[in-house]
């Protein structure tokens, strides 16, 4: 076993945690259905090489921008972003995401006005916004688990900054346009009264 996911209601003894830890198995305390990660018992990494490299790249503004450009190049493979500033990169990404929303809305015939998200009122959003929120939370949980398992820091982001999950958002953004956005619109298109987001 490489990782043990412990969900709500799990009861585990100190001795069991000790034995599991001795085997090198990671333990992750997760939310319902394994979506959110709340704590990690042990990283899969046995060295600090990733976090040291990450800290070096984040701490130098020139290197940080170079990494951000590479991340954006993954999203815009046909565009030259080599001379763009961080502000220009962020603006380009915003335009691209709005275009993806519009295209998915047309593809699935789902009404779309804008992204609306209130963390205190999930049910208050329309179906497509609820589906986007749920899909993104699942993606964040997956990315978070991988980042900490590899021994990198969730908070040392290159594009996103100032949040304890900045790097999680950076990585998740690489995949949203191909994964969570199309999935959310497909779910919204097929949603019925008896379904649960």
Model-found features: residue ranges?
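Active-site helix-to-loop segments that bind/position phosphate- or nucleotide-bearing substrates
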Residues: 36-197
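Glycine/small-residue-rich interface belts in oligomeric ring/scaffold proteins
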Residues: 2-48
């Amino acid at each position: 076993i490489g990782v043990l996911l412990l969900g709500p209601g799990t009861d585990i003894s100190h001795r069991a945690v000790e034995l599991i830890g001795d085997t090198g198995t990671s333990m992750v305390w997760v939310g319902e259905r394994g979506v959110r990660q709340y704590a990690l018992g042990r990283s899969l990494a046995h060295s600090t090489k990733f976090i040291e490299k990450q800290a070096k790249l984040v701490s130098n503004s020139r290197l940080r921008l170079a990494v951000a450009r590479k991340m954006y190049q993954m999203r815009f493979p046909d565009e030259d972003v080599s001379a763009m500033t961080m502000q220009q990169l962020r603006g380009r990404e915003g335009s691209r995401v709005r275009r993806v929303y519009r295209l998915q809305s047309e593809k699935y015939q789902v009404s779309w006005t804008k992204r609306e998200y209130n963390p205190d009122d999930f049910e208050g959003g329309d179906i497509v916004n609820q589906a986007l929120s749920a899909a993104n939370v699942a993606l964040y949980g997956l990315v978070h688990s991988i980042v900490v398992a590899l021994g990198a820091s969730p908070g040392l982001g290159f594009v996103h900054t100032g949040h304890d999950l900045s790097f999680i958002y950076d990585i998740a953004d690489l995949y949203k346009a191909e994964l969570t956005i199309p999935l959310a619109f497909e779910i919204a298109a097929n949603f019925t009264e008896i379904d649960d987001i």
